[in-house]
């Protein structure tokens, strides 16, 4: 009886301590509400959809990542931002929301900017995203 009770509690403790892990692909997501884990399940665009990417400095001297989507992905960006007017979208990198800008107008040019309101190392993020971007385009070129 004692052994089965102890075994039961050990199993119960193990089950309670396991956390649900869900990996998100690096990219842009819809913010679906203001609650925890309020992102769409899949990104509407990923880092593989970037055409160009640059690390720049904004007017306040802060690092920002600027980029342009591939020409055939720009309509998706335009529609996603049109759908999100008055709402937020989020850029996720390594399962972390890096920025979640409020959309005021449709962004029709296919350009975007990733700012750094939470103090993340944008230079490191830029290098990692650039590497992913280059690898995606190398694969595409060799097919």
Predicted regions and their residues:
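Positively charged n-region of N-terminal signal peptides that target proteins for export
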Residues: 1-5
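C-terminal motif of bacterial Sec signal peptides marking the signal peptidase cleavage site
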Residues: 14-15
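Extracytoplasmic
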Residues: 19-109
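Structured soluble/peripheral alpha/beta segments that form catalytic or ligand/cofactor-binding pockets
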Residues: 101, 105-130
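Conserved small/polar residues in nucleotide/adenosyl-binding loops
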Residues: 132-139
């Amino acid at each position: 009886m004692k052994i089965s009770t102890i075994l039961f509690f050990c199993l119960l403790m193990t089950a309670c301590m396991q956390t649900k892990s869900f990996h998100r692909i690096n990219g842009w997501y819809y913010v679906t509400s203001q609650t925890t884990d309020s992102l769409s399940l899949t990104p509407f665009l990923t880092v593989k959809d970037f055409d160009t990417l640059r690390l720049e400095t904004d007017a306040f001297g802060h690092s920002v990542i600027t980029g342009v989507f591939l020409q055939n992905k720009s309509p998706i960006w335009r529609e996603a931002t049109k759908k999100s007017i008055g709402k937020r979208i989020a850029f996720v990198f390594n399962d972390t929301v890096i920025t979640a800008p409020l959309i005021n107008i449709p962004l029709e040019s296919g350009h975007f900017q990733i700012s750094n309101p939470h103090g993340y190392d944008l230079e490191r993020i830029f290098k990692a995203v650039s590497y992913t971007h280059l690898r995606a385009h190398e694969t595409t070129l060799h097919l």
